[in-house]
Structure formats: structure tokens, C-alpha cells
Amino acid sequence: MREWCMLRESRTNTPRRAAERGKRPGGSSVRGGERRIVTALCYDLVGSTDLMHVMDIEDYQELMSAFQLASKQAIASHSGVMQHEAGDGGVALFPIELEAKDAASLAIRAGLGIVEACKRVGREAGQDDLQVRVGIATSVALVLEGSREGWTREPVTGAALAMAARLQAITAPNSVLVSEETRHLAGRSYAFVFQGSKELKGFAAPEKVWRALGHKVGVDRFYAFGRMGGPLINRENELNTIGQLWDGVLAGQGSVVLIQGDAGIGKSRLLREIRRRTRAKRSKLLFFQCLPGGFRSTLHPLLNNLPEAVSGSAGQMGPTAAAVAALFERNGIRDPAVVDVFSYLLGAQGSRLQSNEDPKAIREKAHRALLRALEAVCRRGPAVVAVEDVHWIDPTSRDLLGEAARIIAKFPVLLVTTSRPSYASEWLDAANPTRLALRPLDSDETRLAIKAKWPEHRLALLPDLFDATERISGGVPLFIEEICQWVSQNVEPDTMRLSESANPSHVSAFESILESRLQQLGTAREVARAAAVAGTQVTLPLLRALLPDFGKSALANAADTLCETGFLTRIRVPGRTAYGFRHTLIQETIYNAVLRKQRQVLHRRLFTAVNQNRGMAAWIDTGALAEHAERAGLVEEAVPLFIAAGKESSSRSAMIEARQFLEHALDLCGQMSESDTAEALKLLALTALGPILIGTVGLSSEPARRLYEDAVEIARRRPMSEQSQWFPIYWGWWLTGQDFRVMHDRALEVRSMLSKANEPEIQLQVNHCIWAIDFNLGRHRETQDAIKAGLALYDEKRAKESRTEFGGHDAKVCGLGQLALSLWLTGRTKASDAALSRMIAFTDRIAHAHSKAHSLDTEAVSAFYRDDFERLTEVSARMADFAKRHKMQSLSGQSLLFSGWAEAHRTGLASGHARFQNGLSLLRELGAVADLPIYLCMHATLLGLAGKIEPAIEVVNEAIGRGEETGHAYWLAELHRCRAILRARAGERKDAVAADLRCAVEIAESQGATALTRRARHSMRELGIVIGR
């Protein structure tokens, strides 16, 4: 039995707070400040200003002095230190030398003492209504090394001071309000009343706040969990549920399970038990691990099952198609079509699919490949597919996982996924997954878990261990494992004290435990930090680049020590040994504890080394390397890499990831100072993002139009020698013009600007935009001239790239189609037929999806012109089939519209008109109504045939107005002819009918549209209208 075992690996990590600790720039040994827990107290008299107005000034001053003296005594008697004193209030801090629990407890006692002191001072002064408000908060603060003795006299960097002031402001008179962190630390010693979650000015998230009522004797609360390798505790209900689902799988009914829980709660442990219990009857286990930072890395759970992709063996950057085929074959998947699709999506070298294929077609192929892969996997019997930590999944993997979940019921497969509870998993809802939410253990289960882990010769320490576990772990199993291990190894029976810097929040508590353990490991502590910056995978050569002052043997010994102590694990990859963190949470926590400037130094070293030699860490792809550059502060180096990563994703039809990379590149450009370099980088990002935005948001969308307008504004500032480089920007600016007149003016401007450019492709695309606009403006001679000039420059090899850069379709397909339509309108029917045949044959040969859609649209319009309803029915059917296969909504709308038009004329007016209206509604909803005047003309005609003359005239009036407003002129003659016929049927005056027919003739003749002139004159004869030439 083979498993797809995911090598744990992270591209980069999310940086947080901290500051540099370094002996010298670039030095590998870093020292300086550290993060400590600080509790702050803020107090303020209620209504002191009003008192000043009603009391004698001397009496008021004596009252304030007595109050401040009593308040300071209450603070000092509980180890607090005044930070700031105002006339009627002040701020105090409680020393970092105290354990965090004690500092919080003493601060609350001081606060309650201030309330009592205020009451006493008021009574003695005859002011019984004297009242005070007290706020207390706890947070992490940065304490610089060397200033620890006088830390309270230095500015304190932390949230506690600001939060305490905010809490004081909302506290009821003569009350003490404390933050969630403070209550968490001191909760065993005081009674608290929950006051709800409050919005505090300057803080993004609501804060849970509590009112302190007074001291009370200790309240025991125990939290615990089972160790990964120990007995499984408190999971029997979940296992029974999964057992029932597995029985269904054995009977042929697939199921989806989503296990949710906080980091470290035991999701992986439960999954391990599932693997153990299904081992006897399953034929295969496929295991995938999603990783931090993997959201932008296409199919990264699959990619990291490939040794080449992880190790960069043989100098490869990423996998080869042969490696993908070998991996699939080892797991029983031998279908070449399946291997080809996944090789393409992975960006494997030697992939046989073309990068310019339509993204929707690729997605459809991927779904079919997934279906075949599942069939192959189940060929020998039931299987288990496990995907861990889907909260880090990339969009492409999520799409495929969602599709797998949707169809899994057809196969004997148990699909198990795990995620954190905050992750939005509605994309799995269609599969109706069984959701299992893991909770912490209760007190009895805690005792069982700790006894299973605890050495028998130290059982006497268990009561104290329970107390420490309650304060530190918060019921998270992995935290308890680390706490137990550290306490059992380092805590003496007569002290039973943990780190003084134990933090109130669960994650920071774990950070304190890990930091305490790392301090015992000497230089291995620096190696662990460097490895955390690199990600959850690192090699000795990479560590050498990150820590240049360490020798090879020192690094190897440190890595071995970290493996022996449970921080790292060895990962065997071809040609070398790599190291990965035993759990992603360990890597994340160590990374977050590294001060920001130290992280920046390490990221910079990593970027420099890997950028010079990508083979050193081939698992770090372009996007990940860009993130290292960004976190190193090398924004100018990061932006081109993010752009390159976006292009790589786009070439694999991973449009969501591509858009994310490119939009982030633009954000970084905005952070750069105004410079020539920043402008050029921004244009490069916009050039790549524009076509993606058009494809994902829409051609007529405001975001696409605004992007190109902003880009052109920048491009115009660039030197004339660069203008041809930014031609795709100008082309997109033309394409997203709000109407045809604007588009025509822009096309002429671009042609004038780039008239001296010698590149044939630029000149072709200039003509491409001109013939498209001139056609719609009814300028047929100019249209045909532009097509002739443009197609003379067509290069089929270059066109493979241009199809994605310019409009998403092939210029030759567009040119031949536009020529066919223009020739018919100008009365050259045979030449039109020939051009149409050439277009269809060429489109079928190049097999480009969007170009085929363009061709089908042209075929349908051509049949519409000719009133060839039978031909239009056949073309519409092909349009519908193609739209369904490639998920093209606008083409689906056009198929409904044209098939409805044909049906209304051939078989059923009512049913055909209804189908037509469905198509028109869909196109309007999508914003894909560039030919709206024509569609409205068709709509008005069908209304007229149904005898609904007045509504028909209203529709054609709208169409004429839209055509005149937008410059959409080539069908204006037909619109006037249509209105003349409707007016005649409505019995309107003959001069109104004649006026419309006169306009139709004049417009058609001015455009050289012979076919439309003939129609207008034929209608004159039918209606008995005589108009001189």
C-alpha cells in the first residue's frame, strides 16, 4: 500500500511585531530586547471639574492632594510604579520582575484599593459622592536589554496603557474594569462579572471586559489534552461517527468528513487514528498537507508530494512531467490525459498542454481528470483521502477538492479534511459533509492525559502541574504536551515555577514555553529561529547561508539537537537531508517570537542566497521568493518577482492566484517612493493584470476601465522610446472605452502615437482595434482597408501569445469574420461567403477556445443578416454546446438569443420570443451587450409580429437612441426601417413613415451598405412611399 505523504514545507511566514537584536549589521548572533508582559492601571476621578466650580479652590486642592496620596499609596503597597500623574488621575505599571499572574492580581488589588481610598477621602472631606473609575489591562511590551532596571521610567511600547485608559473611560463610578487578558491571569483569585464585548477606540476587534468584585479563595479550573503519540482521550463520539461512515464506504457509499478545531487541538492525532483504524480494509491512502503561505501556490499539496519539486534534484526548478507521471503510476493512475492535465496545472517541465488554452476549458479538463483519477484509485477497493489544514489551501486545489467532495458519493472513498474553526468552508456545503468540532478535555480527561505522559517517579508533582496547565494551556493538547515535557525536565519539586514571561493568551503562552525550552539548547536556539524564517523545511546549506558565523559541524549538531528535543524532524529527499518542524504551530510560534529586524536580516540573507542559486532551495517558488524579498524590506526586488509569479500562474490558467500576485505587486509599488523604477514596475504589473481583470471581472467593468485609464496616464509620462513596450496597455485602454466613438478616437490616438513603431505585431494590433471600431461606426471602406493591412502582418507563431494579450481572441479570426460581415453589408455576398469559410477553417485549425467562440458569434450574425433561419438554428445549437463545455455564459446567452429568433420565424413565435428574451436578459445581466441596438431591433421586430406595436416602437426608439449615443451606427439604417414599418402598421402619418425610410436610405448610402439600401428601398415600394434620390 502506498501513501502520498506530504512533506511539510512553508514558503514564508506572516511577520508580526518586534525589533532588532543585533551586535552588528548582518551578524548571525542577535541580541537586544525581549517581549515581556506588562499590566497597566489607569484611574480618574468622576466629575472633578464640576467639584472645582462648587468648592473653594483651597479645599479643592486639598481634596485632590489627599486623593492622589491615597491612590499612590494603594498602588505602591501592591508593587505598582506610577508612570504618569494628572490632577485628578494617573497611570501606573506593575513590574516585569513579577510573574505575570502576580502582576495582574496586584494591579486589581490596587485598583480596588483606590476605590476604597476614594470613598474614605470623600467621607473625610464631607464629599460623600466622590467617585473614581479604574481600568486595568495586560499586554505584551518590548523591554530593551540594558534598561530593565529603570524600565518604568522609559516609554513603554505595548497596548496595555492605551487599553487601560479606554477601559477607565467606560467604567461605572467606583468600579474596576479589567481586560480579558488580565482576567485570564488573575481569574483564580478574584470574582468577576462579565460586562460584554466593547468597541474600544484605537482597537480593531471588540474586547471582552470584566468588572472585578473582590478577592476570593482559589477556584480550581483544569484544562488538558492527549499527547499525539499517547492514548486518544475524549474522541470516542467522533470515532464512532467516522466508523459508521467507513462502514458506508465499505458498502460503496463515499462520504466527506470535515474535522474542525483550533491549532494544536488534536486534529492530526484524530486523523492518525482514522488512518490506523481503516488500514486493514482500505486499498489506498492518499495524504495531502496544506501549508502556511500556500494560498498563492497552485496545487501545492500535490506539488510537495513530488521529490523533485521539494529538493530541486538534478538542478530542476520544480517537477518534470515524467516525475508527475511516475507519482501517478505509483498510485495506480496511468491515464495519459489525467497526467497531462495535472502536469500542466503544476507547471511541470515537458507538459504537453498549451499555455494559451482557455482557463474554463482547462478547469473542465481538470474536473474530468479528477473523476478518472478517483476511478483509478478505487479500482482495487475502498480508499481514504486525507487533506490537512484546508484553511491554507490554494484556489485551484480548493476547486478540485470541492469537485471531489461533490462527486465522492459515487466512489468507495472516505474524504477527510481538517481546518481551523474560523475558516469559511461553505464551498464544501454541496457535498453535505459530516462536521466534527473538537473541544478541549474536561478536568477528568486532563488528569488521564497528564498521567499518561508524566514520569511515574514524579507523580507527586501532579497537583501543581494541573495548576500550571490551567494557567498556560487553555486546553490545547499540543500546548499541554510541551508544558509537560518542559516541566518534567526542568522544574524542581520545591519551586514548581514556570517562565516569568508566561503570557496570558494561549498562543503567547506556548511561545513562552518554547522559548524556555530553546534557552536550554544553546546555539540551537539561533538555528531554530533561522529555520522558522526559512519555513517548515530547511537544509544545512540554506542554514549556512542564513547563519554565516556558524560552521558546518555546528549547524549539523544543532539540527540534530533540535530533532532529538522534538522541535524538528528529518525529511529524506533525493540527494540531501532536509529538516522540517514537527508541527506547523511550533514553526509559527518560534517565528513570531523573533524580533522584526532580526527576521528582516534572515529573510534578506535567504533571498540573496536563493536568488543567486535557485537550486539551493528549489522548493521555494517564484512567489515564495518574492515574499522573502518583501519581508526582507527589498520591495524593489520583490515586485518583479510577484509579477513573474503572476504570469506563471496565468500561463497555467490559475487566474485567481495570478490576480492575487499582481494586485499585491501593485500594492507594493504604491509603497515605493515616486521614481522612474516604481513607475516602470507599476506599468509591468498593470500590463499583466489588465487581461486577467477583463477575463475575471468583465470587459465593461469599472475596475478594468479604471485600471487601463490609470495605466495610460502613467505610460504617457514615459519616454517616447518606451511607448511601443506599453502597447498592450494602450490596446486595453482602447478595448475598455465606454462607447464606440471613444474607442475610435482612442484607436486613432494610439495609431498616431505608435505610427513609427517598426514592430509588425504592434501595427497588426493597431489595425485590429481600428477595424473593430470602424465596422461599428459603419465605415466599411476603412474597415476593409484596416483588415487588409493588419492581416498582411499576421504571424501565427507570435499570435499564440497575442491571443491572451489582446482581447482574448485571435486577430486573424477576428479580421476574417469582420471582413465577411462588412463585405455582405456592402453587397459583395460571394466574397463574404469566402471570407466566412476561411475564418471557420482557420479557427478549427488553431483550436483556441475564445477564438472559436468569436467565430461562432460571427457565423450566427452572418446567418441573421441573410435571414437564413435554418442555418441560424444549426449555429445556435453549436454555440450552446460549446458554451456548456467551456462554461461561457455570454456565449450561452447569445445561443438563446439567436435560436429564439430563428424559432420565432420558423415554428413558434411565442416560444421563440420567450427564448430570445431569456438570452437578452442573460446578456444584459452579464454586461455583454456590445451589440445592444441590434438585439433591440430584433426584439422590436418580434413584438411587432406579435401585434404589440406600441411596445415595439418604444423598444426601437430606445435602440435608435442608444445607437446615436454610443456611435453604434452600422445598424442604424435597419433600425429606422424597422420603425417605419411599425409606424405604418400603427397607422401613423405617412410623413413620419417617410422620414424614417429617408433616414434609412441616407445612412445606408453614406456607409456604402448596399444590402441595407436595397432593404430600405424595398420597404418603400411595399409601403407606397416615394422619396426622390
Swiss-Prot record:
Q: Which GO terms describe its biological process?
A: cyclic nucleotide biosynthetic process; intracellular signal transduction
Instruction: List the biased-composition ranges (Basic and acidic residues).
Output: 1-23
SMART domains registered for this protein in UniProt:
CYCc (SM00044)
**Gene3D superfamilies, from UniProt?**
Nucleotide cyclase (3.30.70.1230)
- Positions with a binding annotation for ATP: G261, D262, A263, G264, I265, G266, K267, S268
GO terms for MF: adenylate cyclase activity; ATP binding
PROSITE patterns listed in its UniProt record: GUANYLATE_CYCLASE_2 (PS50125)
User: What keywords would UniProt list here?
Assistant: ATP-binding, Nucleotide-binding
* Pfam families named in the record: AAA_16, Guanylate_cyc
Q: Does the keyword Magnesium apply?
A: no
What InterPro entries does this protein's entry cite? A/G_cyclase (IPR001054), AAA_16 (IPR041664), Nucleotide_cyclase (IPR029787), P-loop_NTPase (IPR027417)
Signal peptide span: none
Instruction: Enumerate the spans annotated as Guanylate cyclase domain.
Output: 39-168
Example of a GO cellular component annotation carried by this entry: cytoplasm
Region span, Disordered: 1-31
Name under which the protein is recorded: Uncharacterized protein R02095
Give the organism's phylogenetic lineage. Answer: Bacteria, Pseudomonadati, Pseudomonadota, Alphaproteobacteria, Hyphomicrobiales
